[in-house]
């Protein structure tokens, strides 16, 4: 049964939702080597994006490192919204002699809001150290196996995860009433 479309914008949104993400070279390599993953639509710059389950992140990252992705350019997290997933992402770059056009891929791990746990990639890319700590501090994502997972920006006794979209600062209303 076809879905009813009431406007041109709804038609475009429906096409985007049902479109199959094109498979990039990294996804092809992962499939060839038996790594379970899901291809996502490339970002606005054309960077290939791949969704990975949390329990498969470490073996997949180890394989990508061996494949030549020797640089963790950025690791971060974001909140999709109240009641939705938290996302831990990893932007990897294959640094070679061709510095003008390096191969890039972004891995995304979608995590539940309650007990978000993902393995640490610190032992593969040391650059993940403070980045994983910041994501823990701001979103409450636990990076299992991290050597020093503690708050890095907020005071040690801070309650809650300030960058979650459902976070309400306990002092917000008191500060607002003071003015």
Curated annotation (Swiss-Prot):
One annotated GO biological process: photosynthesis, light reaction
Coiled-coil ranges from the UniProt annotation: none
GO MF annotation: an example: quinone binding
Membrane topology: Peripheral membrane protein
Keyword field contains Thylakoid: yes
GO cellular component: plasma membrane-derived thylakoid membrane
Parts of the chain that traverse the membrane: none
PTM statement from Swiss-Prot or TrEMBL: In at one experiment the initiator methionine has been seen to be kept and removed.
EC class: translocase
Family recorded in the similarity comment: Belongs to the complex I 30 kDa subunit family.
Biological function: NDH-1 shuttles electrons from an unknown electron donor, via FMN and iron-sulfur (Fe-S) centers, to quinones in the respiratory and/or the photosynthetic chain. The immediate electron acceptor for the enzyme in this species is believed to be plastoquinone. Couples the redox reaction to proton translocation, and thus conserves the redox energy in a proton gradient. Cyanobacterial NDH-1 also plays a role in inorganic carbon-concentration.
Subunit structure: NDH-1 can be composed of about 15 different subunits; different subcomplexes with different compositions have been identified which probably have different functions.
Protein name, entry field: NAD(P)H-quinone oxidoreductase subunit J
Originating organism: Synechocystis sp. (strain ATCC 27184 / PCC 6803 / Kazusa)
High-level lineage: Bacteria, Bacillati, Cyanobacteriota, Cyanophyceae, Synechococcales
Gene that produces this protein: ndhJ
